[in-house]
Regions:
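Gly/Thr-rich phosphate-binding beta-strand-loop-beta motif of the actin/hexokinase/Hsp70
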Residues: 2-23, 102, 134
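Short active-site oxyanion
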Residues: 6, 30, 50-54
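Short glycine-rich, Thr/Ser-proximal phosphate-binding strand/loop in the N-terminal lobe
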Residues: 16-39
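Short hydrophobic/aromatic-enriched beta-strand-loop microsegments
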Residues: 29-30, 72-81, 159
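Short, basic/hydrophobic alpha-helical segments
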Residues: 36-53
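Acidic beta-strand-to-loop metal/phosphate-binding motif
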Residues: 51-59, 102
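Short alpha-helix plus adjacent loop in nuclease-associated cores
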Residues: 77-129, 133, 167-174
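Glycine-rich, often acidic, oxyanion-interacting loops/wings at catalytic, nucleic-acid
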Residues: 129-182
Length: 182
């Protein structure tokens, strides 16, 4: 049945991927769950025809699956999840309907696409995001410590700047004295 052109919509999840295959007329040929494995998805979709293109929402982990499908020879587009949600005509929020919508938007050319960044760039983005999270955590801890000092009315010595060695040498014993006894 490889002569029929089909479009594939994928609703990505950690364990399973809902795969919807539609033909050029928009008829659903298949809409069922497959394992989160590119080979299983390719096998399922190609049973129904020649895959012209596939689409999935851009979300955490989706770019890796998209890259695996591209490596399998597919043309894959990542969809902007916010725009796709607004294009939906009914309130039905199921994996079945989401995969169907992606396949249909791709088929008619209305899929709001986002860029699939190369793996190297995705790794750099992930590294920057993790670093920013650590910076935010450090800032939050410092703010909590300063709030606890204010709450206990502990004032640092004049001329000692916060977070310097001198301030840290002062704060540890001062905080220990202010802490309640168990």
């Amino acid at each position: 049945m490889g002569s029929v052109s089909v479009f594939v919509g994928l609703d990505y999840h950690q364990e399973l991927v809902q795969v919807c295959v539609v033909d050029t007329a928009g008829r659903v040929l298949c809409n069922r769950a497959a394992g989160n494995d590119a080979r299983a998805i390719v096998e399922l979709a190609t049973r129904h025809g020649d895959v012209q293109a596939a689409a999935l929402d851009a979300c955490c982990g989706a770019s890796n699956l998209a890259q695996e499908l591209v490596d399998s020879g597919w043309s894959v587009s990542l969809a902007h999840p916010g725009f796709v949600a607004r294009m939906k005509q009914n309130p039905d929020k199921t994996d079945f309907s989401d995969a169907r919508l992606l396949a249909d938007l791709l088929r008619v050319g209305y899929l709001p696409k986002v860029w699939l960044a190369p793996e190297r760039l995705r790794r750099l983005r992930r590294l920057v995001r993790y670093r920013q999270q650590l910076v935010d955590q450090r800032r939050d801890v410092k703010l909590r410590i300063r709030a606890l000092l204010r709450e206990n009315r502990l004032v640092s010595p004049v001329g000692v700047r916060p977070w310097t060695k001198g301030w840290l040498n002062w704060v540890h014993p001062a905080a220990s004295r202010a802490a309640p006894s168990p």
